[in-house]
Amino acid sequence: AVKQWDGFNLSPGGPARVLPGGIVMGSAGANLPHQEARELLALDFAGNPLWRFDHNLQISTADGASVWSTRQHHDWQRSDFPAGYYAPGVDPQAVSGNTLLLTHVNHVVPDISDKMLEDDRLIEINADGEIVWEWLASDHIDELQYDAEERAAIHSAPGFTPGRGSFDWLHANSAHYVGPNHWFDEGDTRFAPDNVIISSRESSVVFVVARDGFVVWQLGPDFSRTPEQQAIGQIIGQHHAHIIPKGLPGAGNMLIFDNGGSSGYGAPS
């Protein structure tokens, strides 16, 4: 190793990213037994803190204290760094602009399940840590094209975890700004650069959310519904669904890491 920054915990919160000027941004802390971090940090090259955010929700610690936490898990993105990696013309900044965080919130939604949900909530914050936009997955389950069998399976909460006391029903594992792309330039507003692409590992679905909250594009969960999805076949347990940035080979295409394994709801196939 030629350089090391201390103070991060990437296991629950996802990637750390090196930004211009030797600034590193990533998640820190943990809220066990949940798979989530407590704060998002930016450190300079010497390891000095430049920016931090934790004022999302209050949680109780093991000793009963109430503390602020991001409850952030798996992914976060900068508005000026939509794919999370460098591409021509991309110049991300650490302490200006907006940041998108994938977070948890726990509640019961009887229409989904009578078990406590560990629901996915996207929040977008500005440089001052103010929440300027949010999206709650459970509010949009009817838009995600689950059939009756799949909804019944979700209602039974097969992934309920007693240790957590909750059911991570969607298990979103990535959330990216769409970013500049030729589809939008050609008039397809579903791919507006500030819309968000979300990957659901648990139900093998990738979808785009517009800024009004509605799901405007979707891949899965049933890959037999259209000839285009039949040609793909199936994705299972996928991660890092995003639009390839302008200036790179395949720009405008969606890149998905298809992990395989087991996921999805409904009757066994």
Segment roles from a protein language model:
Residues 1-269:
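Histidine-/acidic-rich catalytic cores in large beta-rich domains
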